Amino acid sequence: MKGQETRGFQSEVKQLLHLMIHSLYSNKEIFLRELISNASDAADKLRFRSLSNPDLYEGDGELRVRVSFDKDKRTLTISDNGVGMTRDEVIDHLGTIAKSGTKSFLESLGSDQAKDSQLIGQFGVGFYSAFIVADKVTVRTRAAGEKPENGVFWESAGEGEYTVADITKEDRGTEITLHLREGEDEFLDDWRVRSIISKYSDHIALPVEIEKCEEKDGETVISWEKINKAQALWTRNKSEITDEEYKEFYKHIAHDFNDPLTWSHNRVEGKQEYTSLLYIPSQAPWDMWNRDHKHGLKLYVQRVFIMDDAEQFMPNYLRFVRGLIDSSDLSLNVSREILQDSTVTRNLRNALTKRVLQMLEKLAKDDAEKYQTFWQQFGLVLKEGPAEDFANQEAIAKLLRFASTHTDSSAQTVSLEDYVSRMKEGQEKIYYITADSYAAAKSSPHLELLRKKGIEVLLLSDRIDEWMMNYLTEFDGKPFQSVSKVDESLEKLADEVDESAKEAEKALTPFIDRVKALLGERVKDVRLTHRLTDTPAIVSTDADEMSTQMAKLFAAAGQKVPEVKYIFELNPDHVLVKRAADTEDEAKFSEWVELLLDQALLAERGTLEDPNLFIRRMNQLLVS
């Protein structure tokens, strides 16, 4: 063949093929769903390009997918008259995987086949799924608008390499022929193929036809029979659509192997006319935190496909939402740039955002277990919401979940509504603490008094939490209060000090002055506190001071971190504080104060600038 060359697969493709053939074999029929789905996408792309260039139809505007098989040759063929591919596109799409981060993702997969099948399915198996049942795959394609002699041939046994060549192909589109492996004869059975198409592809908006051979007057007459409904699912009445159809449609548009958690299908008429079908996945995409991660909705205008991944219709903190919007108010020649600056887009975005938040609120109310699955997968993303979307902040806050001292578990299951319902009489604020880990938050000395008083504290240990709490200032009219910041309401919780205790504290004034003189500018202030029950000392920050966790975030991002000036608070009832106060020798007094400060800093920050000095100092005091 002209222009024939043999090329090696990108290493990631080889890995994917190996994993997929072994992990997805138990559900091997999905290859047909994937190939028909790709053919449908090719038809969508042709329709879109034809808006500006009708000649691409080449006089054939009846788009369809055809499935045929040859029992003698043991081949199954899926063909379409969609947009087709050029030689360069064939090499790009069938020889490589363009997604960044693919290599590390594939390397992270283990030998657990159940887990692998979920993850690989979520990855979007697409064209390569053909190799689950075929030991050789042949592709013949020609791009719309190209001359017949610019057709392309591609063939591979799915091992290490593939062959590509130039051919003549009269009709545009793509034809994929699967040379079935031994033992895969079920895919040469007419009834079996029909049932798979009905199961997985009934929602495809263009006809899926199967070859029908009949004997008439001694001759074999070939015709094509439509198997699916061939009506865009979102245009049908909700009452006519089964849950199974909604799930299969999700798998088609999201290229996901798993069922969605929930969905919402709505048709809006009036000032704005649009139909939306929005899904919440059950599992986060493997590349969700990758900056190149594609997200957004499929955009249709008057049922004509316009683009994938239209990000403009959903805020970033809802980037996990999949689905589509079909608008009657946008023009067919709309571009991403026009969408960016469109009043229609902004109105649609606001409406769809509210719709998703309502969908999540309903899920949380109706099925707490499913909502917990959602939170485990997407909670970190939703936590970006309070900073991004002030208008919907209260609705987002209702959806947040936290660990707390009430549950004694690291699971984030407590809602703010739960917390408020359990607030003590006279309690005006919602108390929380941020730390590097759940264990550090739970054991913080800042919690001692609150625990004694039976007051619940939210335990926040995700990196995003401190940043989120800078924007989330109140809920249900009640302000949030970090227990690691100095606050009058925390001091008010302490038991009232009797006269004799007040006299004893007065006697400690010279001690406090000595500590201030020793530490100088290293701390903002030194004072006595009644917030502690078991701990000798803590460090706190003023309300207007940067918190410890925020300083860590700045440092991790490579930003210049302003020095955090702590308030050093001492427990007058603790034996170590009394011992330090009674020490007259200045050198030993200095050692005691430095040790107490280091302990407080270690509890607050988790690290010390000079841990060896801390250990030496502690050892000296232990033997003295």
Curated annotation (Swiss-Prot):
GO terms for molecular function: ATP binding; ATP hydrolysis activity; ATP-dependent protein folding chaperone; unfolded protein binding. It holds the Pfam family HATPase_c_3. It is found in: Cytoplasm. Residues 337-552 are annotated as: B. Residues 1-336 are annotated as: A. Keywords: ATP-binding, Chaperone, Cytoplasm, Nucleotide-binding, Stress response. GO terms for cellular component: cytoplasm. Residues 553-624 are annotated as: C. This is Chaperone protein HtpG. The gene is htpG.
